[in-house]
Amino acid sequence: MSTEKVAFRMFLIPGCAAEYQRRHAAIWPELSALLRAAGVSDYSIYLDQEHHVLFATLRRSRAHGMDALPAHPVMRRWWAHMADIMRYGTDGTPIVEPLPCMFHMD
């Protein structure tokens, strides 16, 4: 199955890095299953500690189902669980900014 790589950034509230990492170390099995079912794999999140910016990369199948994730109850519950430690928009979802690929080497 063909995949594409996606990169984006999110924003952590200063002082919340340890809690962010703790919550992700205990990621809910139903959330992992939901992401996999949506075609997501090889998902990593990195922290720019100086600027409190989270940088994420993932692979997704070309026929991914990520567009349906924001409406899913498990995703909504996870976002509510993370709302106190990340910057969110007025719609109750984390601020996510796509990042264009500027260079790639196999």
From Swiss-Prot:
It catalyses: alpha-L-rhamnose = beta-L-rhamnose. GO terms for biological process: rhamnose catabolic process. It is found in: Cytoplasm. Pathway: Carbohydrate metabolism; L-rhamnose metabolism. Its main location: cytoplasm. Its EC number is 5.1.3.32. Signal peptide: none annotated. Keywords: Carbohydrate metabolism, Cytoplasm, Isomerase, Rhamnose metabolism. GO terms for molecular function: L-rhamnose mutarotase activity. GO terms for cellular component: cytoplasm. The active site is at H24. Substrate binds at Y20, Y43, W78, W79. Belongs to the rhamnose mutarotase family. Involved in the anomeric conversion of L-rhamnose. Homodimer. This is L-rhamnose mutarotase. The gene is rhaM.
